[in-house]
């Protein structure tokens, strides 16, 4: 079963009534809206991107936090969407959004041990990320709680302050900058130019 951005937003609002802390919903909305901006700009450059799907995936990526808990939200979100009958192309974002470079250890806040979740480790290693999924990877790393967009620099500092520094932190930071550069090169300009208000959050 497919999803539109409108339907994904309705899922979020339905969960707002049940969750203990709805800041994750604000974050999902920011990620989805920011993803739409980047996707539209890429389309204008002649790059094949599904704008509504990018927005949809952004809205859905943290749906596994519906119970107010961050721990385990990746698998919980995937199972939530699968149990509702939604296609893999939507459920997969719950698995992919936190991990860069096809590596479960390339994540913020210290990665899981690969042996702790063989399914997730194997999926991330072998999955061919779509451009929409890569956009969500980036936007997740630009959007804090609240309806804001940060530079990568500020957002990474925010993550380190909240989650701590670990043996994989340098690796994750390097891959984050590579991801932003990838989209800058596709656009032919600094993608921060798409977000005039980003300077307000410096």
Mark where each language-model region is.
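Divalent metal-dependent phosphate-bond-processing catalytic cores, especially two-metal-ion Mg2+/Mn2+ enzymes
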Residues: 17-47, 60, 86, 106, ...
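An amphipathic alpha-helix signature
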Residues: 9-12, 32, 36, 78, ...
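Active-site flanking loop/helix segments enriched in acidic
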Residues: 4-27, 57-65, 100-104
